[in-house]
């Protein structure tokens, strides 16, 4: 490393971190007081983050709104939305901003040095010199504002964060966690909702926003993170241009520990659908503060204990409550912050039995603590945790960004930055604790002996939505009636100013101020994992040739294409049932412990592939392990696949009920997922398959099954028979990543018998209507329009560029910026499916019109001669993914199942590089033709149903 004490920075500390193969440099910017950490690692992906301590003083969501707003133009970049411009034209591998409970972080990453410097510069200018400080319209757009309709003489509220949080508060899980934190940490920042409570967001004023920014967004309160191979001197020089404008001052202090308190049970209501029965739908959340950020051993210990107590239906605490019919599901997890909380969540209970449940949990944990915990179970779970920690596989999340998010969890409070990344010593200490009573002592922290605990009882109310809608309407009428003429004129003027700012065309100078890339900056080659196809013992082998650091990943894919419709739900249920039933040699808990003790993972799931419009579904049984443990892998795969005894109807009922509840929660909190599957289920087989495996069709079937013991018994028998039917060598394809020998694979193949006859494929019939409204207890909407076109496959490069144009320009401006929705987008899939979608949308009727008009926008853009290079660059960047060994295995397998190759990807890339503006007319034709005979699905509450054209619409009540 060359001398890095340049550009106003001085080195405080240098340390080699062998555990992550990095050298850490801790620096300080002398003049401004900014802190900086650089991890010098062999990673071509360069990561940056800047974070600020932002403890909230109220529930207005001020720091969440600032997080959104600073990215809406700055002193150097005079655009309304540089963030959206970066999404259009950057090669970024990560671009986001995140509000935590006491900090706000702005992370970016890119493999391209030029792009990386551009991103850093835009973000630094955004956080320190945002246009927010001089333009109240930015606050009105991203936070909240009044809207007055003179025709109806009504007043309403709108705003991106306001609508985002209305969606969040529609989720029972989020509402419960927010309420629990308020009870545990009353009177502190951690008892406030940093995201913003929709009831309190309107209390926030523009002056309050400016004051909060001035206080918290100063370099002395900033911590900067860098990671990867980069020209560090250039980065430090760039940072100095922003930091040197400031003089050092005292940073914002984060409050110390909250005084321990035992809070009384807090009772709140949560909304369920009007059609739902309230009986047995209450939820209980218990919270126990057990340590602070300095005690990292306790976090690992609590992860171990949570898994032992509640990791599966066979775990002792969860099994006890299920067997006594006191709940339908249960979870236990840690919520980590300055102080760490163990949360026990008990779902679908009788509200009158809450005290009984609390007492039973307390007694059970005390008994386990006094009798001692089986050391082999602790050791097995620790092995599993250690495997994941050493694997350090974050999926598509860049490693540097994952490190940044981890580091801020302790660094923000004054801990050494590296503390959060290093685990060897911590694991050794935790293992040492097994010799004594460490784990038993930790258990006592989740009993009534804990002096810092709280409980929340959530009562279902199927009238709450209508009641709150009526109250909100009355409240807005009252506010309007109380306004003077001058106040109303001010509201109208603010809205007019907002619309004028939103619709103003950026100047040429403003557009040219934003740093851009050219097509020459795009890497000429792509690195996409591709499976090599071999045949072994009559079975197809998919080998993914990437380095795995001694880990072997194997997936066994059993073709289930001779099943369709309702039968596919049984495949999905089977994947959930495996590992929850006894086998020839093990109880469920013993099998799980064997897997944890010897493997990295052992799992069952479902997979699908689509070739030329024909869908193939699979039961997937997989495992990962060190090369030295592959004998155990073979042994446990055999045990799971061939000897599982699925014959316990009570356990099948538990699983069916839990899956039903999970789907119900998903339909409320992630309504766009449901809307997309419903819209596509009326158009293509893939949509129908998705519905039966995990959508509304699955939910509807499970509701019917769970109401009848006879149907549960039939389901149990069907699933048991299905396992025997599917685990057949004729159906098998094996995906392998890592140094697995043919001998090992032959051994796996030999496990499975080979039946006779051909596997006759069945087609799954379409299962949705062309125009649907799914009624859920949600205060915001999710609106989708889908269509099909066989021209997409031959124009995939064009449609990928159009996705960028529509998602980050047209839809962003019309649905997010003007409409106030939290999210929106357009997607075109290789099978020909096209979809528009909105997310946490206050006006789905308007969004549907925007979708229809998109083709006119594309034709107009095609005739304008506008340079669309930035959209090409952004589109290519989206598909140049970062690959870890586990991700490589998944991607290469998925590509094969879908008939996609590295050559296909390279061809599409070449097509994208040659797209011109005039080609957009062709895209408009494809979209116009598809959606003219397409389908519409909207998921929301009653108030939005009233705003839609109901002609020909099917209304589904959840």
Segments predicted by a language model, with ranges:
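Non-catalytic, conformational "gating/processing" segments within enzyme and secreted inhibitor domains
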Residues: 208-242, 715-749
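Non-catalytic terminal extensions that flank enzyme cores
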Residues: 1-47
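Hydrophobic, small-residue-rich alpha-helical packing segments that form membrane-like cores
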Residues: 150-152, 156-221, 225-240, 247-273, ...
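His/Glu-based metal-binding/catalytic segments typifying zinc-dependent metallopeptidases
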Residues: 40-42, 49-51, 162, 166-170, ...
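Generic recognition of flexible, low-complexity loop/linker segments
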Residues: 94, 210-214, 271-274, 317, ...
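Active-site His/Glu-centered metal-binding helix of metallohydrolases
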Residues: 62, 66-70, 574
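Extended, domain-scale alpha-helical bundle/helix-rich regions
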Residues: 434-475
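M16 family metallopeptidases and their MPP-like homologs
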Residues: 45-55, 81-129, 136-147, 174-199, ...
């Amino acid at each position: 490393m060359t001398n890095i004490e340049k550009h106003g920075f001085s080195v405080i500390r240098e340390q080699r971190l062998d555990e992550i193969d990095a050298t850490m440099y801790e620096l300080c910017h002398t003049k401004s007081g900014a802190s900086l950490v650089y991890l010098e690692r062999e990673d071509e992906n360069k990561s940056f983050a800047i974070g600020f301590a932002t403890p909230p003083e109220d529930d207005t969501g001020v720091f969440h709104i600032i997080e959104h707003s600073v990215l809406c133009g700055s002193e150097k970049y005079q655009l309304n939305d540089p963030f959206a411009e970066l999404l259009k034209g950057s090669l970024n591998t990560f671009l986001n901003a995140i509000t935590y409970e006491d900090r706000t972080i702005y992370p970016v990453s890119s493999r391209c040095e030029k792009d990386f410097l551009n991103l850093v510069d835009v973000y630094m200018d955004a956080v320190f010199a945002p246009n927010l400080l001089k333009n109240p319209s930015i606050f009105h757009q991203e936070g909240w504002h009044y809207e007055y309709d003179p025709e109806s003489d009504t007043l309403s509220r709108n705003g991106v964060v306001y609508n985002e949080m209305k969606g969040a508060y529609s989720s029972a899980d989020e509402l419960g966690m927010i309420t629990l934190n308020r009870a545990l940490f009353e009177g502190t920042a951690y008892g406030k909702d940093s995201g913003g409570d929709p009831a309190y967001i309107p209390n926030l004023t523009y002056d309050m926003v400016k004051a909060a920014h001035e206080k918290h967004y100063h370099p002395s309160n900033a911590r900067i993170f860098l990671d990867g191979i980069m020209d560090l001197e250039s980065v430090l020089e760039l940072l100095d241009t922003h930091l040197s404008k400031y003089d050092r001052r005292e940073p914002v202090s984060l409050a110390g520990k909250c005084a321990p308190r035992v809070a009384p049970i807090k009772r709140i209501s949560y909304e369920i659908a009007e059609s739902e029965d309230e009986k047995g739908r209450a939820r209980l959340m218990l919270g126990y503060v057990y340590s602070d950020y300095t005690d990292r051993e306790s976090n690992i210990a609590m992860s171990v204990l949570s898994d032992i107590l509640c990791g599966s239906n066979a775990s002792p605490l969860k099994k006890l409550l299920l067997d006594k019919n006191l709940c339908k599901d249960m979870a236990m997890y840690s919520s980590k912050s300055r102080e760490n909380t163990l949360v026990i969540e008990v779902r679908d209970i009788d509200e009158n039995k809450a005290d009984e449940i609390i007492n039973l949990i307390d007694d059970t944990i005390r008994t386990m603590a006094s009798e001692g915990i089986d050391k082999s179970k602790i050791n097995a779970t620790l092995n599993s945790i250690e495997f994941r920690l050493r694997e350090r596989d974050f999926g598509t999340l860049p490693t540097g960004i994952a490190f940044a998010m981890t580091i801020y969890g302790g660094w923000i409070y004054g801990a050494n930055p590296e503390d959060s990344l290093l685990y060897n010593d911590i694991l050794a200490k935790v293992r040492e604790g097994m010799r004594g009573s460490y784990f038993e002592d930790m258990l006592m922290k989740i009993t009534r002996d804990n002096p810092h605990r709280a409980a929340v009882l959530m009562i279902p109310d199927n009238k709450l939505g209508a009641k709150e809608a009526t109250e909100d309407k009355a409240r807005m009428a009252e506010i309007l009636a109380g306004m003077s003429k001058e106040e109303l004129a001010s509201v109208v003027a603010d809205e007019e100013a907002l619309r004028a700012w939103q619709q103003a065309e950026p100047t040429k100078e403003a557009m040219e101020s934003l740093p851009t890339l050219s097509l020459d900056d795009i890497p000429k080659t792509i690195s996409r994992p591709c499976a090599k196809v071999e045949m072994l013992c009559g079975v197809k082998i998919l080998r993914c040739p990437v380095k795995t650091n001694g880990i072997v990943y194997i997936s066994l894919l059993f073709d289930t294409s001779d099943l369709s419709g309702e039968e596919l739900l049984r495949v999905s249920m089977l994947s959930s049932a495996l590992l929850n039933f006894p086998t020839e040699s093990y109880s469920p808990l013993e099998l799980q412990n064997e897997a944890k003790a010897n493997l990295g993972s052992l799992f069952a799931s479902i997979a699908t592939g689509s070739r030329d419009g024909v869908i193939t579904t699979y039961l997937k049984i997989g495992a990962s392990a060190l090369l030295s443990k592959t004998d155990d892998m073979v042994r446990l795969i055999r045990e799971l696949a061939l000897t599982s005894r699925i014959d316990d109807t009570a356990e099948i009922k538990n699983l069916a009920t839990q899956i039903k509840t999970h789907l119900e929660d998903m339909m409320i909190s992630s309504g766009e997922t449901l809307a997309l599957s419903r819209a596509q289920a009326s158009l293509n087989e893939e949509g129908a398959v998705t519905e039966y495996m995990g959508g509304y069709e699955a939910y509807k079937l499970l509701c019917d099954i769970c109401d009848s013991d006879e149907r549960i018994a039939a389901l149990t028998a069907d699933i048991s028979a299905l396992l025997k039917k599917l685990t057949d060598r004729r159906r098998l394809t094996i995906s392998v990543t890592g140094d697995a020998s043919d001998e090992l694979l032959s051994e796996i193949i030999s496990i499975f018998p080979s039946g006779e006859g051909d596997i006759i494929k069945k087609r799954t019939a379409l299962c949705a209507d062309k125009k649907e409204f799914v009624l859920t207890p949600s205060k915001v909407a999710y609106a989708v329009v889908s269509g099909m076109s066989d021209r997409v496959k031959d124009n995939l490069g064009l449609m990928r560029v159009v996705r960028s144009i529509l998602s980050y320009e047209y839809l962003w401006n019309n649905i997010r910026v003007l409409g106030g929705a939290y999210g929106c987008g357009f997607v075109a899939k290789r099978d020909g499916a096209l979809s528009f979608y909105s997310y946490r949308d206050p006006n789905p009727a308007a969004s549907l019109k925007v979708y229809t008009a998109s083709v006119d926008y594309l034709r107009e853009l095609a005739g304008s001669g506008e340079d669309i290079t930035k959209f090409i660059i952004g589109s290519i960047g989206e598909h140049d993914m970062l690959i870890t060994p586990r991700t490589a295995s998944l991607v290469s397998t998925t590509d094969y199942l879908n008939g996609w190759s590295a050559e296909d990807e390279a061809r599409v890339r070449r097509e994208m590089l040659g797209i011109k503006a005039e080609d957009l007319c062709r895209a408009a034709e494809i979209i116009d033709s598809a959606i003219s005979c397409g389908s519409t699905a909207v998921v929301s509450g009653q108030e939005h149903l009233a705003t839609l054209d109901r002609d020909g619409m099917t209304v589904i009540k959840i």
